[in-house]
Amino acid sequence: MQLFIALPTKADTWRYAIEESLTDIQGVYASRFKKIIEENSTHKVLLYPFGTLGESTDLLEQAQAGLLQFVDQSPGFIGTLIPEAQVFLLPYVLPEKHSEIAYFFKHSKTIHQTFHKLYGEQDLELLTMFPEGNVAITTREVFRSKAGLSGMKIRVMSSPLLIETYKAFGAVPTPLPTGEIFGALQTNMIQGQENPWFYLESAKLYEVSNVITEIGHNLYTTAVMANKKFYESSTLADQALISRATKAATDFIIEYQRELEVSAKLTIKKSKPNVQYITLTDAEREPFRQSAKKVQSKFIEATGPSGKAILKQLKEDLNDAKNR
């Protein structure tokens, strides 16, 4: 009897850059991805944490050019290249229940069909998207209303939609690179900023803030991409392995990010006991929700029929997650 043995493909070194440290959520995801690739092939995956290859915009350009094989990028940064990606930044659209969040990110047609095509047009192979936790707002002073945010300079990513969001919320949106947030808070160049809980803890942003407020407006979302030419020129075996590693890492991180958020809240409170946590009530959130409708209109205005269709599909996906 003749035996057929699958010979290993040529060993390659794959470069993977993230927007965070290796101990943050993107780093944990990338490390899990790397482990699966290296255990099941002769390939090596080199991880580049935040700061080693430049800012987020630099990483994206390097991925498009093929200098990186993989990259993580949030819609807040890629939205300037793919305006429709900002749909994930729309306030009060994504769910708060964990079961709905998990189902949505695993089964969304918006992610796995529509955006796969849009990212492909930019020389990027969209592998997956995953949540990094609830976004909270750090400030020096307490606010419970839009009036409380009035005149406050709040740092946001360089997304036109985030800028519109904080204008609608009554604040003064101030785009800054990630690496400048701490210093800007410290010198009162800005009076606040938004980020997921794990990042508030790891970047120690609570040290230069007195209040952390949840208004329930969004989840921080990240996309994992490969350079399209690299992916399409890979063997079928390598593509299957990338898909397997992507799915396993995504399944893991969806649960992990929830646990890390709880841990981050405890760590911050232990490190700075006098920091004040505030969660707005439904009644307090309502004016923010009403203002969010204007932001949806701005999104459609900026993205046209494509954005309108994507928002419609996204809401259908979310409805499926809620009623499954």
Regions found by a protein language model. Give the residues of each.
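Sec-dependent N-terminal signal peptides
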Residues: M1-L3
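N-terminal secretory/targeting leader peptides
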Residues: A11-I101, F115-R324
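Signature of the catalytic double-stranded beta-helix
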Residues: F104-F115
